[in-house]
Amino acid sequence: MMKRIPAILVLEDGAYYKGWSFQQDKQEITIGEVVFNTGMTGYQEIITDPSYFHQIVAFTYPEIGNTGINNQDIESHSISIKGLIAKNICKISSSWREQQSLVKYLSSNNIPFIFGIDTRSLTQYLRQFGTMNGCISTDNLNHSYLKQKICEIPSMQGLDLIPHVTTRNVYPWDEKSFPNWYLTDNIRVHRVIQLKVIVIDFGVKLNILRRLATLGCQITVVPAHTPLKDILAYQPDGILLSNGPGDPSAVHYGIQTVTNLLDYNVPIFGICMGHQILNLALKAKTFKLKFGHRGINHPSGLNQQVEITSQNHGFAVELTSVFESPVRVTHFNLNDTTIAGTGHNQSPYFSVQYHPESSPGPHDADYLFESFIEIMTKSKNKVS
């Protein structure tokens, strides 16, 4: 039986919360940006999502871990978060798909976690004062000392975290969505023309790749630093700019690559970080949100059409800057009216701030992958 030990969460402004953790082989202090996610389900997908790199995630739902961990519901091949915060972590999980408990999964990967704190109070605090750096510690419980340690770490603004999560090597991808991912077999699969898609990996979620493969695309994933000439050498029918962590304005090499790609009129689809990088390349600007959008029930839409979407980002495209660029707004976040999607007025470029691949979350926006297929097909037919 794992031994319960005292733990503490400290925020950079000095606020702190006392709770509990379990004894791990390696006791240490972990520091990262403290954010909250409002999803009731999908904790496994969340903690393995590379977009959460360098972040300590607080789950607002009062208990997580009930269904354990399995080898399918992962969005990368390692845990991405720096730490986990919960009101309660279920120690006796149950699911026919379970292969290990959440506690064992976190402990075996030396991911610090704290439970037994008032996560509602913490969430309200972050909403009022904004997301900020913080730490979880079981090694040293002196909050004054820990506050000093936190202040040594830079804030998320200005951080380029892509080198930590992008692939080091080019690789093909052909794994499709799991058979039970859809409740219907009525899925259009485009097999007449096999479209070549280059995915620029800023921290791509695996289900983005699965959705493209399911629709019959020939996928090649390339590192974020890949030179333009190497990308064009594949003669792609389309470019997908993936999700990823950090401040998009700090990813200068990615912005420059996309800026140069615009000269070739190759269809581009941006998701989350990719959305921000595409808009920065189109001369728009981004800014840091006070506490971000992280959850699986965010309404997005325009002109009386609404999609319930999965979102995970701390930055957004500045609305006034879009008016000075060649794009139009296609979606707004209906909670705070920030931009949730844009499209180019003349060229085949479009992007969304949310996750159409869900995992976790609803499938309302999955049609965007179909839209990408249609845009690539039309563009390919024009060339031929």
Swiss-Prot record:
<keyword id="KW-0028">Amino-acid biosynthesis</keyword>
<keyword id="KW-0436">Ligase</keyword>
<feature type="binding site">
    <location>
        <position position="312"/>
    </location>
    <ligand>
        <name>L-glutamine</name>
    </ligand>
</feature>
<keyword id="KW-0150">Chloroplast</keyword>
<feature type="active site">
    <location>
        <position position="355"/>
    </location>
</feature>
<dbReference type="GO" id="GO:0004088">
    <property type="term" value="F:carbamoyl-phosphate synthase (glutamine-hydrolyzing) activity"/>
</dbReference>
<feature type="binding site">
    <location>
        <position position="246"/>
    </location>
    <ligand>
        <name>L-glutamine</name>
    </ligand>
</feature>
<dbReference type="Pfam" id="PF00117">
    <property type="entry name" value="GATase"/>
</dbReference>
<keyword id="KW-0067">ATP-binding</keyword>
<dbReference type="InterPro" id="IPR006274">
    <property type="entry name" value="CarbamoylP_synth_ssu"/>
</dbReference>
<dbReference type="GO" id="GO:0044205">
    <property type="term" value="P:'de novo' UMP biosynthetic process"/>
</dbReference>
<dbReference type="GO" id="GO:0006207">
    <property type="term" value="P:'de novo' pyrimidine nucleobase biosynthetic process"/>
</dbReference>
<dbReference type="Pfam" id="PF00988">
    <property type="entry name" value="CPSase_sm_chain"/>
</dbReference>
<keyword id="KW-0055">Arginine biosynthesis</keyword>
<dbReference type="GO" id="GO:0006526">
    <property type="term" value="P:L-arginine biosynthetic process"/>
</dbReference>
<feature type="region of interest" description="CPSase">
    <location>
        <begin position="1"/>
        <end position="192"/>
    </location>
</feature>
<keyword id="KW-0665">Pyrimidine biosynthesis</keyword>
<protein>
    <recommendedName>
        <fullName>Carbamoyl phosphate synthase small chain</fullName>
        <ecNumber>6.3.5.5</ecNumber>
    </recommendedName>
</protein>
<feature type="active site">
    <location>
        <position position="357"/>
    </location>
</feature>
<feature type="domain" description="Glutamine amidotransferase type-1">
    <location>
        <begin position="196"/>
        <end position="382"/>
    </location>
</feature>
<dbReference type="GO" id="GO:0005524">
    <property type="term" value="F:ATP binding"/>
</dbReference>
<dbReference type="GO" id="GO:0009507">
    <property type="term" value="C:chloroplast"/>
</dbReference>
<dbReference type="InterPro" id="IPR017926">
    <property type="entry name" value="GATASE"/>
</dbReference>
<keyword id="KW-0934">Plastid</keyword>
<feature type="binding site">
    <location>
        <position position="244"/>
    </location>
    <ligand>
        <name>L-glutamine</name>
    </ligand>
</feature>
<dbReference type="InterPro" id="IPR002474">
    <property type="entry name" value="CarbamoylP_synth_ssu_N"/>
</dbReference>
<feature type="binding site">
    <location>
        <position position="314"/>
    </location>
    <ligand>
        <name>L-glutamine</name>
    </ligand>
</feature>
<dbReference type="InterPro" id="IPR050472">
    <property type="entry name" value="Anth_synth/Amidotransfase"/>
</dbReference>
<dbReference type="GO" id="GO:0004359">
    <property type="term" value="F:glutaminase activity"/>
</dbReference>
<dbReference type="InterPro" id="IPR036480">
    <property type="entry name" value="CarbP_synth_ssu_N_sf"/>
</dbReference>
<feature type="binding site">
    <location>
        <position position="51"/>
    </location>
    <ligand>
        <name>L-glutamine</name>
    </ligand>
</feature>
<dbReference type="GO" id="GO:0006541">
    <property type="term" value="P:glutamine metabolic process"/>
</dbReference>
<comment type="pathway">
    <text>Amino-acid biosynthesis; L-arginine biosynthesis; carbamoyl phosphate from bicarbonate: step 1/1.</text>
</comment>
<feature type="active site" description="Nucleophile">
    <location>
        <position position="272"/>
    </location>
</feature>
<dbReference type="InterPro" id="IPR035686">
    <property type="entry name" value="CPSase_GATase1"/>
</dbReference>
<feature type="binding site">
    <location>
        <position position="276"/>
    </location>
    <ligand>
        <name>L-glutamine</name>
    </ligand>
</feature>
<dbReference type="InterPro" id="IPR029062">
    <property type="entry name" value="Class_I_gatase-like"/>
</dbReference>
<comment type="subunit">
    <text>Composed of two chains; the small (or glutamine) chain promotes the hydrolysis of glutamine to ammonia, which is used by the large (or ammonia) chain to synthesize carbamoyl phosphate. Tetramer of heterodimers (alpha,beta)4.</text>
</comment>
<feature type="binding site">
    <location>
        <position position="315"/>
    </location>
    <ligand>
        <name>L-glutamine</name>
    </ligand>
</feature>
<feature type="binding site">
    <location>
        <position position="273"/>
    </location>
    <ligand>
        <name>L-glutamine</name>
    </ligand>
</feature>
<comment type="pathway">
    <text>Pyrimidine metabolism; UMP biosynthesis via de novo pathway; (S)-dihydroorotate from bicarbonate: step 1/3.</text>
</comment>
<keyword id="KW-0315">Glutamine amidotransferase</keyword>
